[in-house]
Amino acid sequence: MAAEFNNDWDDLLKDEFEKEYYLNLRKFLINEYKTQKIHPSMYDIFNALKFTPYKDVKVVILGQDPYHGPNQAHGFSFSVKPGVQTPPSLRNMFKELNSDLGCYIPNNGFLESWAKQGILLLNTVLTVREGQANSHKGKGWEIFTDRVIELLNKREEPIVFILWGRNAISKEALITNSIHKIIKSVHPSPLSATRGFFGSKPFSKTNDFLVSINKEPIDWQIPNI
């Protein structure tokens, strides 16, 4: 579980894999994958970092931990595999995208095309037991993903950080470089979306910022499959 990303994250994160917290996390995960049903597949844990190299990151959308239902999680925050029903929070994201930018609501929740455009779809915890939300909280992943955020904060090219909900907003303390843009609101979950997520226009705000720094805006439209 010391990963190879096959991009610039390899050099940036290589020291993390030697640290005591990560070695303990690795031991824990080896046992969990042997004895429990864990999501995502161990081959998908680091997909966010594999698909979106450090130098290419334009936007970060922080999630909490992976979906814990069968066949949902595949290493990207909020995204589900093709053929899997779109979860409620992602449905609300698509509703906001529709009202914000006029994107049609797709028949799937597969967000890989966002990752390929420079959106780092990063959960703060990268694994979970099936049916047990937050079951891998406090095992070491937070230290690892905080390091990812710290490295992004150091970058000299601006990044948009999208922080939805208390867990994500708590990471704002790591984003100290004033060149970056922070967009935050309540979570798109049905429990909170009507209290400030709907109407917050995060997608057009992101594109407006990217255009202002002479970057290509994101094509947010997820195509039907």
From Swiss-Prot:
UniProt-annotated catalytic positions: 65 (proton acceptor)
InterPro entries: UDG_fam1 (IPR002043), Ura-DNA_Glyclase_AS (IPR018085), Uracil-DNA_glycosylase-like (IPR005122), Uracil-DNA_glycosylase-like_sf (IPR036895)
Gene Ontology cellular-component terms listed: cytoplasm
Domain of life according to the entry: Bacteria
Subcellular location: Cytoplasm
GO MF annotation list: uracil DNA N-glycosylase activity
A Pfam family that the UniProt record links to this protein: UDG
Reaction catalysed by this enzyme: Hydrolyzes single-stranded DNA or mismatched double-stranded DNA and polynucleotides, releasing free uracil
Main location: cytoplasm
EC numbers on record: 3.2.2.27
PANTHER family registered for this protein in UniProt: URACIL-DNA GLYCOSYLASE
Job of this protein: Excises uracil residues from the DNA which can arise as a result of misincorporation of dUMP residues by DNA polymerase or due to deamination of cytosine.
Family named by the database record: Belongs to the uracil-DNA glycosylase (UDG) superfamily. UNG family.
Protein name: Uracil-DNA glycosylase
UniProt source species: Clostridium perfringens (strain ATCC 13124 / DSM 756 / JCM 1290 / NCIMB 6125 / NCTC 8237 / Type A)
